[in-house]
């Protein structure tokens, strides 16, 4: 909605992908999205009195793979809902480049430089990579971030440590928020920084602070 207001004020439509990229790379929203997702799946996997019977009938490996598949489908559905909502509310048009409403907004309204709306898509992002690449990387990195948190929650729940699992995942999110907010080098230890594309780049120079490929390796190794 904020990005639509930005486009309306500038007088040109957004690219249809820009609202989703803005949501997926917002430091504030990337804090809330995993929290909402974890609340939605907080009871997963359900460990009831019949669980041991199901595991015995299906086999431990098949049961565990079923839980992983459920996590993947939950993540796919959650991101699809966010993506579709952004497409509908964004009222954008399709093109293969960033819109002028994003790239030239601060030049047209310098008095608003640095406010929340103008920082939804920072120059670290649109000056560095094509918009389609940004959208694809946002989807993949967010999915891997959610999957890692879900896996931690699932593993501890299977050990009957549900409270410890919730505490652990929210601690990981909180540490990511704190380190990202001050851009401490330690932020790369936590998954949040690795899921936000613009943190990987400098504002003007086409030179990465940390290659995005490193974040893919980070998630692949941990998962």
Descriptions of predicted regions:
Residues 175-202:
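Extended hydrophobic/aromatic segments used for targeting, binding, or gating
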Residues 57, 159-160:
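Helix-loop interface residues and adjacent transmembrane-helix termini in multi-pass membrane transporters
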Residues 1-8, 177-182:
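Alpha-helical transmembrane segments of multi-pass membrane proteins
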Residues 40-56, 60:
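Transmembrane helix boundary and interhelical loop/hinge segments in multi-pass membrane proteins
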